[in-house]
Amino acid sequence: MDFGNETVLKATGITKKYGAAKALDKVSIEIKRGMIYGLIGENGAGKSTFMRTIMGLISIDEGSIELFGTTDLQAARRRMGQSIETPALYPELTARDNLRIQAANGGVSDREIEDLLKMMRLENTGKKKAKNFSLGMRQRLAIANALITNPEFLILDEPTNGMDPAGMAEMREIIQRLVKERGITVLLSSHLLDELSQIATHYGILHEGHLIKELSKEELAQESRQFIKIDTSATEQAVTVLDSLGYRDYFVQSSRVIQPFEGIDQVAAINQALVEAKVPVDGIHLVGQKLEDYFLQLTGGNPHV
């Protein structure tokens, strides 16, 4: 889907103070239509605070916010939906009745409600009350609530928090479908680095209220990509061995260096195969870093934040 180059959110120099402490310090973020922008940071980094300023739930002390190219934020926020922290649901009501209440003033038809339930995989919950839903079901219902007004921009704070791997995968699929099928732009946060790397197209790393780095998905992959470095005087023979092992993703950097990008946990086996084929190996070792290591390098924090 071609989303063009429209700016959905332009936050410039956002600062939020609580007494002498700065929860946000001159944070500037620009989000284009069609992006899934992921905020990464440990608890207390400022992720929720930033989202709340965009939604108008808390004021800012410095900076400016534009939504859809306008500073008329009251009108622009009608084009947004959000699910922040604990989902605000009616625990004694069913999924359908929760959505009907949300839809009461919006002219939303029962057909549209059924479509939302189906998209969120809640169509078969029947008379089951929301208080008896699993965490994943509650999160999906909260997103359905946020979609009632058919928003163009969706803000999700920790949408996979507390979920098991199956629930996380399901939530990823739903968010990606929203972007693909409805053209929705998404801002979401997480403290699970690996999880966010599987869904976002762009990233902002927050640390102690500062935006310390922005990257695209491709740039992040390059920063955290690992490979094996093989130093040999017989690159052609080494390539033949790699081919025989079934490896295809490698780069012949020079007449002496080959970089395989797969089999990174098989360094010893690759070395053994080269030696058995009488390929002279002057050096073989793993190069690069994992996503968690990259985050640690930037923040000095805990990778499992």
Label each region the model flagged.
Residues 1-15, 301-305:
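ABC-family P-loop ATPase nucleotide-binding domain
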Residues 6-9, 16-188, 193-207, 211-213:
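ABC transporter nucleotide-binding domains
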Residues 12-14, 27, 250, 284:
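Generic beta-strand hydrophobic packing signal
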Residues 73, 110, 217, 235, ...:
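Residues at or immediately preceding the N-termini of alpha-helices
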Residues 77, 99-100, 114-117, 169, ...:
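Generic structural signal for individual residues within well-ordered alpha-helical segments
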Residues 172-261:
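ABC transporter nucleotide-binding domain
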Residues 226-298, 305:
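Short, charged/small-residue-rich alpha-helical element at the C-terminal edge
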